[in-house]
Structure formats: C-alpha cells, structure tokens
C-alpha cells in the first residue's frame, strides 16, 4: 500500500511538473480559440435600474494546452460590462491557461439605468471581449438594451430580415416609448400607422447572411402589399433616425440603410416627418407611389430621395446635406415638387438628377437598360448648391423622341451653367422654355440665411422673396414648412416663407 501511495504521489508530481512547463503550451499561430457564441445578447428590457448576467465558454480545440496572453473589454474602465473569467472577476486578465480540448466559462454582467440620458445609456449597449493568443486577436460581442423601448421586430434580429404582417389590417405604433428597429423590417399585407410624436430609432451596422450577402443591417422595407403612413404634426413631428445619439454621432450620416417603398406599393405618405443619418433617405421603387408633405430628408451618405420608375408628390419639403444627389430620379416616372428646397453644398453630385433610363450593366456602356418616359414638374422650388450645375439631365434619346423626357420648372430658382451648352446644346434654351419663369442664380445672389450651417430659411434680401405663384390646384398650399401662412398674392419660393 505504501509503495502504491509513493508511486501515485510521484506520478502526480511529475504530471504537475509537465503541465506547468511553458513549453507544454502551444505557440503555433494557427492555434486559435473557439467560442460557444460570437454574440452574447442580454434579453432583458429594464424598466428601472437593474443588472443581468449571461455566460459563454472559451474552448481550446487544440491537442495541446494554450495560454491566452490577454483577455479584456475593449472599452476598458469605461465599459458598462464586468467579467468573471474562470472564477476570477475583473475587466482584464493575463496568461489564462486552458488545457487541451478543454474549456472555461466567462460570465458577463451589465448594469443598466434605462432612465439615464441616451448619451449615457444608448438603446443598444455594445461591447467587445477581446482575446489575444499567440499573436491572434479574436473577439466576442456583447449586446444589451439600454432603454425601456419597443425593440422591433425582435431584440434578436441582427442580420435576420423579418416580415411584419397584419393580414391586410393595420397596426398603430402609438406607444409613448420609442421604437427601435433592430434588423431589417419588411412590411407586408399591413398598413403601419405612425402617429404624431412617435420616435423611431434604427440600429444599423454591417450584417451578413446567405440570402443578401454583406449589407447594412438597419432598414424599413415596405413590400408590394404593405403601406406606411406617417402622420406627424408641426408640434409633434415623427423622427426616424439612427440610434447613436452621442455628440459625435448625433448628425453623422450612414448609420443605417434607409426606407424603401418597394415595387408597386401604393398609398404611402409622410407628413411632418424627419428622416436622417442614413445611407439614403427614402427610396421609391418601380410603380410605387409616395406622398411627402412638410418633410425633411438630410444627413445621408448617398441621396436623400430616390425615385426609380415611381410616382412621388412632395410639398413643402427640405432635402439637404446629402453626399449623392439630394433628389435622384431614374428610369422615368411621375414627379411633382411644390414649394421644395433642394440644396447641395460641399459635394460634386448635383442637387437634382433626372433621367428616363436605368443601366442594368456597366454605367459606361449601358448596353442593358430600361427606358420609361419621365414627367417631372417643379413649382415654386429652389434647386441650388455650391457647384456650377445643380441640375443634371439624362435623356436616353438625346431629345429625339417626343414625350420621353418631359420636364417643367415654374417659378423656380435654379443654378445651371454647363447644362446650357453640353449635349450638343440640347438644353441651351432651358431657361425660358422648360424653366419658365425661372431665376438662374449664382453664388453672389442672396438666398438663404446661413447655408454653411444648414439654415435654409430665406435671407431678408433673398431673391426668392415674393417670387412664387400661389398654388390653388389640385390642392391649396398656403402654409410653409414651419406652419407660417404664405402670402396670398406673392408667396416666397422654397419650403420657407420669410417671416417679417
């Protein structure tokens, strides 16, 4: 018995010695860790201050022990999360050992105050747990919900498009709590009513799946049998924007994808709405129809409003600070803009782009293309910016096919130069023919109060003052974007009536 105990003790000591030698750990750079999840989500929506704990496992799939040189939270001491790695609490850990084909637990805890300002407790609280092993850096994402909100369609929808259907009835988003769109929301066989004062925040980011590949995860998409009706008021507008409200992100473009009015969707309307901080504002696809009234579209990393072979009516709308065309019309369709201000400063893209075709292959060759007649009417509107030409036209027939490119500007302020001479002088008589009566303004003309700071109200000496024509048909438009009564005889051009 004594011999057995001595042998057992000796074997145990030998094992300890072997297992604790540094050379026992693999240093192969191809030896990586595995994790039981790539994203750890905390599913609790707090109504008061509270904490939640979730866990995942770090797996060593290798046939030799491995040493994780560093485990830490990316935000460091500022992180809202705390960790417990293999029984040890903290925010940073060094030289964590995992035996061959073994695993250890990582517990993550978060404390949320849903009543804190959004700048402190955003809708989606995100963090990364970083792992450094043999020169490799790996990560596990942590996500928690920082506000008492309606997370829609689901708090687990990142990278997973979901269809909202109400069997051809309607849904009212009238909860006083904000709505957070997390993922891609398809609206089908349903009318979604969005009443005055509703706040909608869209959580964007890069996502990837087999159906769409890599794309921006954060979109509202209205399918053919779906409709969206936004019913804001001057006092209580509906605001649709990204969910990052920290100071550095408050006016940052490209945070989420945008709103798509899909092919053949009818009866969509936005009244007193603001759509901002997206890749594009609103995209109306083939044969869709859309009405915009008293709506602002701005801070986009491409175009503010896109119409492709669609029907759009816009009254008293302000579209600005867009990296692409502020308004981009392609492949024809029917468009009417009344009392709109379309402004483009600091970018090479024109404020307005109009064409009656669409290329389905390389834009330079455009061998495969769709052609459809364009009817576009602009009345009492400003199309202006910092470039020489803020209007860009594309008539696939070069003016040879009557009725294919029908454009008309009445009582408008525009800015054109090269447009009047290019395309074999096709538009040399644009001012006076298609644009009549019009003012072709220059940068020397007084127009806005302060375009450099996105104040598009009219200057006291603005050339737009009193130059519009009252619009009585097909509907009376007698107030401006801010609810100011327009002059009954000589209203001002653009979305703002100057207030004396």
Describe the function of each predicted region.
Residues 51-52, 63-68:
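Short acidic/proline- and small/hydrophobic-mixed sequence motifs that coincide with surface turns
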Residues 15-18:
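C-terminal motif of bacterial Sec signal peptides marking the signal peptidase cleavage site
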Residues 74-92:
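Short, solvent-exposed loop/linker segments at beta-strand-coil boundaries, enriched for Pro/Gly
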Residues 22-24, 33-44, 49-50, 93-103, ...:
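Beta-strand/loop edge motif enriched in small/polar residues
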Residues 58-62:
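Asparagine-centered strand-capping/turn motif at beta-strand->loop junctions
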Residues 4-13:
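Sec-dependent N-terminal signal peptides
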